[in-house]
Each structure stands twice: as structure tokens, then as C-alpha cells.
A protein has these predicted regions:
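Non-catalytic interaction-recognition regions
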Residues: 1-92, 102, 109-568
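Beta-lactamase-like hydrolase cores
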Residues: 95-96
Length: 568
């Protein structure tokens, strides 16, 4: 498709002393379409050219040679040169591309670039909390978008399956394991054991020492300890997969922290060799004072590795195994400092700059229920599976009330309920904290997942009523010149660009907003225009546009992890 900004930059670039890509950055999209589709502001040129922006704009306008296939006209308003695109040719390009690429519209060719997306990463034997839900759906969306854009993408669930707490879990299980029903409610029961042993440790120093020994044994591969640890892990994963299956989330690798346990020595050796390790109260640390950060502990005084060391080992391993161009970590902003530290220390691991430059923490904000924050330690825990099932249940109630005879009720309720929760996690700027409120999340008329699904279903029912989708080659493009159709075409045109912004800015909300805008525009189009029963040529063109909108809504929602119901 024509890249309009590039075209404008090329024209202007041949007339002024400024590189095309610089010019491209200045090109704006006017809020008011009366000022054209693109506008080039001349203020920046005013200084070097020693002329007023208005005069420069006027001169540019006179010199620019417009290709009428691309632009209908150019106008000067104030210090701007405004470009009006040839809407017929735009419409044709967009719909033709959709016709050719179908469910691949917006996708790109396979690239020779490896992207790691690390997401979810819950902790074994602990509750999968609402923060984990967020990383899971955000990470999964990035994973899908990267893949769609042709990147070789690797999704990693960096399980929190290691740490001194397992020494405690083992001790607790050894003492009271038979009292708890682990098969039924593994995480809840394991948490109870953990709390109980923790209390005991606080009272009895000897028990704490036993726990420490267990952990050491675990590190050294003791059969009993490893067996128990495996049991905790398997039980936990079975629980986690209930959530993943509901969400439709997948991973390419489940290599968690434990996997790196025997790989931390190399990290220590390299840092030692590079003279970066300093002794501090028996521990080994990397001083980061000159970077304005507290030191990064690499090795505790008892010799065991910590969370950060395993992350550093993971960076080495991932660089070698996947030769990544980018490795993004979708983790809550509470860990900002951790990632700043390990990314800094990673620079001392003799890695190619390509790798250290490719590390990126994509931080996201917390989810609050109206009554406060949701976390494991505080009482106010909301279990993710319960939340997802409640979403489905609530939708089912709405359906039973409004459309009790609907076919595939359960299946649709699941898609709508889950889709609503997913969308809610992706639609606002990721770094912002968010409030989880059922009334907002499930509002079918709001800026929500269900709204997008609702409009999608509407496009489906229009096509069903029509009974046919005309062939693109038979469409008279000039029948789509009305305001509402043109608005839709311009949005559709942006789709690939939006996907690229998602990965450049690490923001899923761009895609979420895009889908809302597309859905709203179709709704306007639908309200303002008769689709069926019009003159045949108009009808065909509008049916085709309807098909195009449905197609892109489905692709885009799919990339966010949202499935489309067949009825609503
Ligand atoms: N397991 C950690 C938690 O639940 C998150 C792990 C994040 N990823 C990492 N590479 N450190 O808080």
C-alpha cells in the first residue's frame, strides 16, 4: 500500500535541506479532516530558511508536483501544507489488500529476527494472582503481534520455581503433609503449609535451620527434596494451566529459575574475572553506586545464588540459545529496580552489545479491586480462576435474561466473559494502575471487549442476511465515498502501522483503541447508511466494506487473545 507519509517526505525532501526521515517525523495527522489527511508544519524550517512559515508553506505548495493518483489536492493553512489523499485510490488499495491477504491482512513477511517475550512467570506453590493475570495477557498479546509481524518469537514462562522458600515448604510437608488435601486444592493447601511452617520458623531457630538445610539439599540434588519439589511444581502447573487454558495462552518454554541454578556459577566467574564482584558483609555484590542504584547482590553470605543471579544466568543462556534481537520482560513495575540492576550488571558479562541493548522491561501497573489492592499476603485475595469463571457466569446471566434461546450459549459466554477480562487488561496505558470493576468490564456499549465482539457479530449478521459477499473485482469503489465509509477506510489503512506501534512503544493499548475506533466507526456507518435493499452497486460495496471491517476486527481481537462469539 502507498505510504503517504513517505510520499510527502520524498516530495518535500527534494525541495528543502532536510533528510526524508526527519521530515516524516514532523508530518502530522490533523484532527479536523477539513485540514486534510496529512499536514506538514513549516515552523522548523523557518529559522534556517529565514522566512515565515506561511511563506515557506506557500512556496512548497507551488513547487510540489502532486501525483493525482495519490493526492487530490494540497492547501496551505497558516504555516502548514495540508495534503488531501485521493480517497478512491486509498479505498481501492485497502480493500484490495484485504481481499488478497484475508486473515493475514496487516501481517508481514517472515523476518530474520528473534524476539523473546517473557510473561506470566508465576511462583510455584503460591497463588496465581491478578498481577500474574496481567502479565499473562499482556505478554501473550505481544507474542502474537510479534509473530504476526514476521518475527521469530519465543514465549517463555520464567517460572518462580526456586528459592529458599522451598526449603520451608519441604520441611512443612515433611511434618504435616498428610493433613492437607493437595490433590484437590494444591495451591491453597500449600500456602497453608507455608504459613504454618513460617510461623514455626519465627518461633524456633532450629526449624529455620532445618529449612535452610533442606534448601541446600535441594540445590545439591538430594532425591527426597527434589522429588517433593517436583510434586509441588507439577501440582502448581496443573492449577496454572486451568487459567492458561481458559485464556487460551501458550508458551514455547517453561524454563524457570531452577533451570538456571547450575548456570549461576558462570555468572559469578565472569563477574569475578572482570573485577566487578565486591565482598560486602560476606556477600558478593556488584556495586552500582555510580549508576545511582543500590548494589546488586550476586551471592549471599551462605554462598547461594539469588533471584538476580538466576536472571543473569538466563540472559547468558538466552543469548546463546536464541540469539535474541530483543528480549522483553513483561513484569509489574514493582520490579523496575530489579530489572535496571540486572540490565546494568549484564553489561559486565562479556556479551555482545546486541544482546544487552535488546533487553527491555515492559512494566505494567497494578490492578485494584474497588476495596484495595489484590495480593497474596494481604487478606483481600481474588483468585484468578474464580474471577474468570465469574466473568463467564455473569455473561451467561445476561444472555439468559436477554436472549435465552441463543445457540451455543455456554461457548459464547466463555468467549465474551474471558474476552472482556483480557480486553480490560490491555486497553489502557500499561503502566497505569487500574481498577477492576465489573460494570465497566462487561459493559456491552462501553469501550470494552464485548463491544468489539458485539459489532463483529453485527457485521456477521449483515453478511448472513445478505446471503453473499460480492467479489472484490466487481465492487464499484466510488460507491464508498460517504463520510462514514471513508472514516472506516482510513482506520483500516492504519492497521499495520498500529501493530508496529504496539511493538515499538510496547503498548497493547494502541491496538485496543484501534479496535474500539473501528467498531465505533462501523456502528456509525451502520446507523447512517442503508446496507441492504439499496441500489445493487451500493449494496455490494457496503457489504464488502462490512466484510472488511469484520475481518479486521477479528484479526485484531485475535492478536489480543480475544475470540469472537458467533452470536450476541
Ligand atoms: N516470579 C516473579 C513474580 O511472580 C516474576 C518473574 C519475572 N521475571 C524475571 N525474569 N525475573 O514476581
Amino acid at each position: 500500500m502507498i505510504n503517504y507519509k513517505e510520499q510527502i517526505a520524498k516530495q518535500i525532501g527534494s525541495l528543502v535541506e532536510m533528510p526524508d526521515n526527519e521530515i516524516e517525523k514532523f508530518i502530522e495527522i490533523p484532527n479536523n479532516t477539513e485540514n486534510g489527511d496529512y499536514a506538514f508544519p513549516c515552523f522548523k524550517l523557518s529559522k534556517t530558511l529565514k522566512k515565515s512559515p506561511q511563506i515557506i508553506a506557500q512556496e512548497l505548495k507551488e513547487k510540489i508536483q502532486i501525483d493525482t493518483e495519490i493526492f487530490n489536492k494540497i492547501e496551505v493553512v497558516g504555516g502548514y501544507v495540508n495534503f488531501f489523499i485521493n480517497t478512491n485510490s486509498l479505498t481501492k488499495q485497502v480493500l484490495q489488500e484485504i481481499d488478497q491477504k484475508r486473515e493475514k491482512y496487516g501481517a508481514e513477511e517472515q523476518k530474520n529476527k528473534n524476539i523473546i517475550v517473557e510473561y506470566s512467570s508465576p511462583n510455584i506453590a503460591k497463588e496465581f494472582h491478578i498481577g500474574h493475570l496481567r502479565t499473562t495477557v499482556i505478554g501473550s498479546a505481544f507474542y502474537k503481534v510479534y509473530k504476526f509481524l514476521g518475527y521469530n518469537t519465543i514465549g517463555i514462562n520464567h517460572l518462580g520455581d526456586y528459592g529458599t522458600q522451598f526449603g520451608k515448604m519441604i520441611e512443612g510437608y515433611k511434618r504435616w503433609g498428610t493433613e492437607y488435601n493437595l490433590e484437590e486444592n494444591p495451591i491453597e493447601e500449600l500456602t497453608k503449609i507455608y504459613i504454618r511452617i513460617n510461623d514455626l520458623c519465627k518461633k524456633d531457630e532450629n526449624v529455620l535451620e532445618l529449612c535452610r538445610e533442606n534448601f541446600k539439599k535441594l540445590e545439591d540434588g538430594d532425591t527426597y527434596c527434589v522429588e517433593l519439589w517436583n510434586k509441588f511444581k507439577d501440582l502448581s502447573l496443573k492449577e496454572f494451566y486451568k487459567t492458561y487454558d481458559l485464556l487460551g495462552v501458550k508458551f514455547d518454554s517453561l524454563t524457570g529459575e531452577a533451570f538456571y541454578q547450575d548456570k549461576t556459577q558462570e555468572v559469578i566467574d565472569i563477574l569475578e574475572k572482570n573485577g566487578k564482584l565486591v565482598e560486602s558483609q560476606g556477600a558478593k555484590i556488584v556495586d552500582l553506586e555510580d549508576k545511582g542504584m543500590p548494589p546488586c547482590i550476586i551471592c549471599k553470605s551462605n554462598g547461594s545464588s539469588i533471584y538476580a543471579t538466576r536472571d543473569l544466568a538466563a540472559i547468558l543462556y538466552r543469548a546463546r540459545t536464541y540469539d535474541f534481537d530483543k528480549c522483553i520482560y513483561v513484569v509489574a513495575y514493582e520490579q523496575n529496580l530489579h530489572f535496571k540492576q540486572i540490565f546494568e550488571v549484564a553489561k559486565y558479562l562479556d556479551l555482545d552489545k546486541k544482546y544487552t541493548d535488546g533487553l527491555k522491561h515492559v512494566a505494567y501497573g497494578m490492578t485494584r479491586v474497588p476495596s484495595g489492592r489484590m495480593s497474596t499476603r494481604e487478606g483481600n485475595v481474588v483468585k484468578v480462576n474464580d474471577l474468570l469463571n465469574e466473568a463467564i457466569q455473569r455473561v451467561l446471566e445476561i444472555i439468559n435474561e436477554k436472549n435465552p434461546d441463543m445457540e451455543d450459549k455456554e461457548e459464547n459466554a466463555k468467549k465474551i466473559g474471558i474476552g472482556a477480562v483480557i480486553f480490560n487488561n490491555l486497553c489502557s496505558t500499561l503502566i497505569k494502575d487500574q481498577i477492576f470493576d465489573w460494570n465497566t468490564v462487561l459493559n456491552f456499549n462501553g469501550e470494552t471487549g464485548p463491544y468489539i465482539q458485539y459489532i463483529y457479530v453485527r457485521t456477521k449478521s449483515v453478511l448472513e442476511k445478505a446471503g453473499y459477499i460480492p467479489e472484490f473485482s466487481h465492487i464499484d469503489i466510488s460507491k464508498l465515498q460517504d463520510k462514514e465509509s471513508q472514516k472506516i477506510i482510513k482506520i483500516l489503512y492504519q492497521f499495520n502501522n498500529i501493530l508496529n506501534q504496539v511493538i515499538e512503544k510496547n503498548e497493547t493499548s494502541f491496538l485496543a483503541r484501534f479496535l474500539i475506533e473501528l467498531a465505533q466507526s462501523y456502528s456509525n456507518f451502520y446507523n447512517e447508511n442503508k446496507i441492504l435493499g439499496e441500489d445493487k452497486e451500493i449494496q455490494d460495496a457496503r457489504i464488502y466494506l462490512t466484510y472488511a471491517v469484520g475481518n479486521v476486527l477479528k484479526i485484531g481481537a485475535g492478536l489480543l487473545g480475544i475470540e469472537m462469539p458467533n452470536k450476541m
